[in-house]
Amino acid sequence: LSSKQETNGAIPTYFDSDLTPAEQLRFSATTGLNGAVLAKGARLTGNAEWKDVALEAGRFIKNTIIPSLDFSDFEAYYSCSPKPLYFMDNETGIKPHCNLSIQWCCDLMLELYRLTGDKNWLDDGEYLLNIMCLYQQIWDPPFYPEYLYGGFGVMNTDGEWNDGRQSRFVVTLVEYFEETKNLQYLKRAVAACRASFALMDIPENHDGNINQLVLGKQFAKGDAGCGKAVPGVGY
């Protein structure tokens, strides 16, 4: 990862077969994921090179991504909501967001704070975390039969209400609570964790009327458990 860093601090995530960085999303918020890995690795091992690369990645996110709120990754453009890379909302000028890249940037800022003790990184991380939390469901919509409170959507250009990534966000929220003691983050983590279990096809959820989702009926078998889940234990 460290050898692939660009001169502006970005670390590409997508490469051609010869390991040349793909031009699409070459300088994007996915840098947060790579930077977070290097920052944590530097903290655990004391590797000075990884630390320097992670700091450059953090400065790229701080100076380039945050001012424009350009939280782009592969899913924002090439998944179930395809659009051109130059797309933005005509009314607001807001670019497509995929909140996985927001989470990755949150993780990078937190790891840089833990690595350096510089509270400016933590402040930037909380700013990003607050943006990520805008995607959390803080009500249980009556027009869906499942219990959706506390779950997370995916993008600002698509219609998912709750998605499996909400279980990933639990750890990020808890770690920010541990560093800041902001109880809101812990409450949001608990709600997201509960929402993750609430979407499971298990007898407890059916008996408690939390959901009546049945694998193979309401959603495809191949969409759960890497295609290995069976009815009654699916997600």
For each predicted feature, which ranges?
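Glycan-recognition and catalytic cores of secretory/periplasmic carbohydrate-active enzymes
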Residues: 1-235
